[in-house]
């Protein structure tokens, strides 16, 4: 193998640049040429390929986002479009492709491997932490720290004004950001897709807190359950005198300098991706499980089901009495 390519696909996540850096520097260390594909699969289809060298990845370790940029590519579901992507790989002599992204990105890599025998390696990069085969994804820790910073600041003003605050965080189908940030931020209630909840239980908890002299109430809501305005309306219907505000954190969760954990994880995964290609292993997704870097067959990895950490959720309820 002489030349490898790398792309970032789907939603961006802090730490993607650290992974790109690791792939490029490890590849060069082993004597490989490294090509960058701009704008994910869309750029692969449209032949947006650049050369990457040591200078290309200098001073990016600490930066959020992705220097290769990213884009959605619905057209990639069509085989004739994927053929164009394969032709781009052939044109540039790319023998192995590293894909950084989430579930949809890996399914694209899976199809390239199945249809055109492309050597592919997946690196999980998404703030949602919803990839079944790995304990943590690149970007998750940074996103949680961003949310915690917001919770801390909102609590300051909530205490001053004796208010309740709803903080809506990302997570359409997975509530890991809500769970981890809610637990670490001391939320009175965490509302997420994986667990049933009761509006009456929430309002009873707020009422009890007021009676015992509590000055603030923090409710962390995953966006996939409902919107913050909808939840606020439900609460106000039951507690009309409650001073209630809501904050939708939105895309602030995707930006910012990656944490130490995300930088280290991305560096490990990026380096391992190159090593797997040099070992002639393909159709693999790299993961971290039990603090060890491992890899799985892409078909098996995509068929896994992520087990929700019920113990952490129960702990959050115990600690929020």
From Swiss-Prot:
Pathway: Carbohydrate degradation; glycolysis; D-glyceraldehyde 3-phosphate and glycerone phosphate from D-glucose: step 3/4. ATP binds at residues 11, 72-73, 102-105. The active site is at 128 (proton acceptor). One of its GO terms (biological process) is fructose 1,6-bisphosphate metabolic process. GO terms for molecular function: 6-phosphofructokinase activity; AMP binding; ATP binding; fructose-6-phosphate binding; identical protein binding; metal ion binding; monosaccharide binding. It is an enzyme of class 2 (transferase). It is found in: Cytoplasm. Keywords: Allosteric enzyme, ATP-binding, Cytoplasm, Glycolysis, Kinase, Magnesium, Metal-binding, Nucleotide-binding, Transferase. ADP binds at residues 21-25, 155, 186-188, 212, 214-216. Mg(2+) binds at residue 103. InterPro entries: ATP_PFK, ATP_PFK_prok-type, PFKA_ATP_prok, Phosphofructokinase_CS, Phosphofructokinase_dom, PKF_sf. Catalyzes the phosphorylation of D-fructose 6-phosphate to fructose 1,6-bisphosphate by ATP, the first committing step of glycolysis. Belongs to the phosphofructokinase type A (PFKA) family. ATP-dependent PFK group I subfamily. Prokaryotic clade 'B1' sub-subfamily. This is ATP-dependent 6-phosphofructokinase. The gene is pfkA.
